[in-house]
């Protein structure tokens, strides 16, 4: 299920103190984002099927940039003496100090969805395995599919997620890889903070400033939904392509009727489960295989209908 490679992750948890039924905390980003609701549902369904193996505590924050709120949740989980923390960090750098507190408290920490900044993690002298997809590869797949509908010299805009997050940066890089290979010009790059309304505002601004834009590449499907509304409001439906990333339920009818050309599925319902499975292995003292960079890669696929 998980891609295995050469290096084994170090195990730093105190096994002797682990109760028979470990408590695992799932800490996500905004539960206003359908992607994280799907992730939570998947984790709860898995726990129900494995209720004898662990207890699950799940939490999310009010919006995608609420690092203070997410920090408070992690601090509460430390006080609650959970055995493992599976976290999709709201910020790749700002969340590292509180994650170090969790590691120092003997909690097994697994990073999912958005990778913590490796340099900052290293500077804190901790090891936090990342369980998740190759975001750059996923975005490149979407971008390459879009490029086939365009021609060299066409102009496009990229609506990025929260710019301080690794997954936003990686998806932008993947989109750019595909556009550069096809000689398509990225004329605008702005952050939509992963959110529908902000994504729509950014899309409207791009369409107004660059009337020749032929496509909008959104770093997630929530922003793609906003972009679809902006395209319609600008009277450019059918003339400006929109692509996204996540394959949330809200995007599926738009893929069917052509309002959205493509997205990437990174299997939200399974992402937290991958992290939980890894945490349980470490808690039990089992060997967990990963790449040399501490990454356990999970699937990502192009979706066009």
For each predicted feature, which ranges?
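Short, low-complexity disordered leader/linker segments with a strong preference
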Residues: 1-23, 55, 100-107
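Hinge/cleft segment of the Venus flytrap/periplasmic-binding protein
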Residues: 20, 159, 163, 167, ...
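Extracytoplasmic "Venus flytrap"
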Residues: 23-50, 57-73, 82, 88-92, ...
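Hydrophobic alpha-helical segments within soluble ligand-binding/sensing domains
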Residues: 24, 70, 129-156, 198-199, ...
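Short, solvent-exposed amphipathic alpha-helices that sit
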Residues: 35-51, 138-142, 166-185, 202, ...
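Short beta-strand elements in bilobed, periplasmic/extracellular small-molecule ligand-binding domains
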Residues: 49-63, 155-158, 176-196
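Hydrophobic alpha-helical
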Residues: 84-104, 175, 187-188, 192-253
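Flexible loop/hinge segments that line or gate small-molecule binding clefts
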Residues: 92-93, 97-137, 148, 155, ...
